[in-house]
Regions:
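Active-site entrance/lid segments in N-terminal catalytic domains of soluble metabolic enzymes
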Residues: 1-175
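Residue-level detector of alpha-helix initiation sites
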Residues: 32, 181-183
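Conserved active-site-proximal phosphate/metal-binding subdomains
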Residues: 156-175, 183-358
Length: 358
């Protein structure tokens, strides 16, 4: 664990809630947030979150066991609420003494109550105040408020506006973790000044030596300027921030009809790789349609996301895959270990707080 002693202001109620040394969360990035990265984050004093959306149930069991075999520190698992085996996944988490259930979508009331009764801290991700207020009414313990600067699926509200708005909306009983655009100790202090109880970072953790993303892909991230990302709906029908590559430029110029064959192939591939049933995919598509303003063509396109992300992040095939990223990639220039990163962030935060107190 990082041996940097945090300023008292950094010992937030979130630290007490989940039992971590520092109020820093490593987000559950699909194909990225596996046992190695989560373990490194836990060892460094932060909260690491496994990404289960791209795992089968057996793979999730293996990944949880791999983390637990190397650390007794708290960590979490990110879940999709629309998978057929959600209860089985939660049961595995409870049996392994996982601390946090992080949700990519608003969880159902019965999931929230069930997780809390089992001792799990419930923490969904939200992109608007109204979403935060809705889950707060269900009794969640914390929310990750992701602003527009964030990577992957994201909203339209800048982090600097979303964070205080969500804080005001959920009241004092729900911790707020600010996400989107953070990478430094000064950013951590800024988030706390906005009323947050900590920060969550994805791209910054992706760009560490503990991330399993191929080195050549990391190099492409490091070469991306602040203006080198785009929020596109051409990947899977929903707004998603990705690195602007030649493929993305081509997708941006194409119609949904031109992308339909790719989407159908992706759906078949994702079904084969995750063991998802055809019924579960159809059910998920219907849920997406009813819970959003997406058209049916956009729903069909949704299968693109995991397959194209895997092609880019795992296989390094940016000619056929995409690289989800936050805008913060444009200001990241090196690949530290997670322990080095955490020590640097807390050291910078300490120095920033000392400077502001003069």
């Amino acid at each position: 664990m990082s041996d940097v002693t945090p300023h008292p202001a950094l010992r937030t109620r979130f630290c007490e809630l989940v039992g971590v040394k520092y109020p820093v969360v490593q987000t559950g990035m699909g194909w990225v947030a596996g046992a190695r990265l989560v373990t490194a984050t836990a060892h460094a004093g932060g909260l690491g979150i496994l990404a289960s959306a791209t795992m089968t149930l057996d793979e999730l069991k293996e990944q949880i066991a791999a983390v637990r075999s190397k650390t007794d520190a708290p960590f979490g698992v990110n879940l999709r609420t629309d998978v057929a085996d959600i209860e089985a996944r939660i049961a595995v988490m409870v049996d392994a003494n996982v601390k946090v259930a992080s949700f990519a979508q608003a969880p159902r009331a019965d999931l929230v109550s069930g997780c809390k009764e089992a001792g799990l801290v419930v923490m969904p991700t939200v992109g608007a105040r109204r979403h935060a207020e809705k889950v707060a009414e269900l009794g969640v313990d914390a929310v990750i408020a992701q602003g527009a600067e964030g990577g992957g699926h994201t909203g339209q509200i800048p982090t600097s506006l979303l964070t205080p708005d969500v804080v005001a909306g959920v009241g004092k009983d729900v911790c707020v973790i600010s996400a989107g655009g953070w990478s430094s100790g000064a950013g951590l202090v800024a988030a706390l000044a906005l009323g947050a109880d900590g920060i969550a970072m994805g791209t910054r953790f992706l760009l560490t030596t503990d991330s399993r993303v191929p080195d050549e892909v990391k190099a492409q991230y490091l070469a991306t300027p602040v203006t080198g990302t785009v929020v596109s709906t051409r990947v899977d029908g929903a707004p998603q921030r990705v690195v602007r590559t030649d493929l993305v430029n081509k997708l941006e110029k194409s119609s949904w009809l031109a992308n339909l064959p790719r989407s159908l192939r992706s759906a078949h591939q994702f079904r084969s790789e995750t063991g998802a049933s055809l019924w579960s995919l159809l059910k998920e598509g219907r849920a997406m349609k009813e819970g959003s303003e997406l058209s049916w063509p956009q729903v069909v396109m949704a299968a693109n996301a995991p397959v194209m992300t895997k092609a880019g992040l795992v296989d390094g095939r940016t000619d056929v895959g995409v690289l989800p990223t936050g805008q913060v990639a444009g200001v990241i220039t090196e690949l530290p270990s997670v322990e080095e990163l955490m020590g640097r962030i807390i050291g910078e935060a300490n120095a920033t707080l000392d400077r502001l107190s003069l």
